[in-house]
Amino acid sequence: MPKLYDNKVDVAKKPGWLKIRLHRTAQFAEVDRIVREHALHTICSSGMCPNKAECWSRRTATFMILGDVCTRSCRFCATRTGRPLPPDDAEPGQLARSVKLMGLRHVVVTSVTRDDLPDGGARHWAAAVEAIRRENHDATIELLIPDFDARPELLDTVAAAKPDIIGH
C-alpha cells in the first residue's frame, strides 16, 4: 500500500525496460509532412497512439478517412466525438497520392464511424480503395471498417471495391 505524505501518494518509478526514447527521425518527419500536406488524418494522431513515433519512423501509418470526428463515443477510443463535417470528395485521391509518395506496399485504412451518413460512408470507403488501387497497383489494401449499423448491403459496397483484407 502506498504511503501518504502530505496528501501525496508515493508512486514507484517505471522500470527501465518499460521506458522508450522517442526519436523524431527523418522518416517520421517525412510521414508527418505528407499527412499534413494532403490534409489527411491518421488514427495514430487522433487516437493518441503511443507507438506513433516507432511506426512513423518506419514510414508506416494507419490512415483514417471520413474526417476526425466520430458520431459515437466508445469508451476505449480517444477519437473526438461530435457532429462531423461532410465527407471530403478529394480525400480518396489525396490518400492515394500519399500512399504513392510514402512508397507503401501495404496500406492500412480505418475511419471514424459516420452514423450521420445514409450509407455510413460505404461509398467513400469504396472510392478510397479504388483511388489507392489506381495509383498503387501493387500495394495491398487492408481495411479496418466500422460496423455499418449491421447493414450487409453496405459491407457489399465496400467489398465490391476489392480490398485485399477487411477487418472490423
Pin down the residues of each PLM region:
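Flexible, acidic/Gly-rich N-terminal and inter-domain linker regions that tether
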Residues: 1-72
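Conserved Radical SAM active-site core
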Residues: 58-167
